[in-house]
A protein has these predicted regions:
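Membrane-proximal soluble regions of multi-pass membrane proteins
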Residues: 3-79
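Hydrophobic alpha-helical transmembrane segments
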Residues: 1-3, 7, 91, 95-96, ...
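Zn2+-dependent cytidine deaminase-like catalytic core
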Residues: 44, 87, 93
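Functional transmembrane core segments of multi-pass inner-membrane proteins
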Residues: 103-208
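Short, positively charged
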Residues: 47, 99-100
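Membrane-water interface at transmembrane helix exits
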Residues: 2-7, 11, 74, 95-99, ...
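Select subsegments of transmembrane alpha-helices in polytopic membrane proteins
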Residues: 77-85, 129
Length: 209
């Protein structure tokens, strides 16, 4: 499912922007085939072949098909099984560490969101609000019960995470006239602060720089 999110969400956002621009210009909005995270069924980008359930088994289908579309034999990017393997390994690690608990459920949600954001950012340099903002509020909700840190540390972490990169952004822009990062980075660091508390922000900034 994360491969679907990584591939489709930026396309859905781009279509929304095109429609909004057309509306502002009082032009006719472009017409697109309906695209959501659920529909239509995944297809080969080369020939449009609809991928069956047997061809959509994580990792195994890619290996069985030898990395090629069953219809047109076009190469299927190895990144698809990479995302699937990474998701499986990190999900198993989260389950092993936290077990079948409230904290385990949160760790899985955080893991999946960060994987999706990492690959979307690598492809498009976008960090969608539709992931970062629910992630922020999700972290605060989990820490309402002190799941990963106390609520005060989570709230301070969210505020400090946003303001830290906001300050760097504006300092850099005033000094150079250029934008060094996007607002999505502010929201993502705020979300991480909301999940893990302000104490993790220095090491997070250091590792991501």
């Amino acid at each position: 499912f994360l491969n679907v999110v990584i591939h489709r969400l930026p396309k859905m956002m781009e279509r929304d922007w095109h429609c909004q621009c057309a509306e502002l210009r009082e032009e006719e909005a472009p017409v697109y085939e309906k695209l959501t995270l659920a529909t239509p069924r995944s297809r080969c980008p080369a020939c449009g072949h609809a991928i069956s359930a047997l061809e959509n088994i994580p990792v195994l289908s890619w290996l069985f098909l030898r990395g090629k579309c069953s219809a047109c034999k076009a190469a299927i990017s190895p990144r698809y099984p990479l995302v699937e393997m990474l998701t499986g390994l990190l999900s198993a690690l989260a389950a092993l560490v936290f077990g079948c608990t409230w904290a385990g459920a949160g760790a899985l949600l955080l893991t999946w969101a960060l994987i999706a954001l990492t690959f979307i950012d690598a492809d498009t340099q976008l960090l969608p609000d539709s992931i970062t903002l629910p992630l922020l509020w999700g972290g605060l909700l989990f820490n309402l019960f002190g799941t990963y840190t106390d609520l005060a540390s989570a709230v301070i972490g969210a505020m400090a995470g946003y303001l830290a990169l906001w300050s760097v952004y504006w300092g850099f822009k005033l000094a150079t006239g250029k934008e060094g990062m996007g607002y999505g980075d502010f929201k993502l660091l705020a979300a991480l602060g909301g999940w893990l508390g302000w104490q993790v922000l220095p090491i997070t900034i250091l590792l991501s720089s």
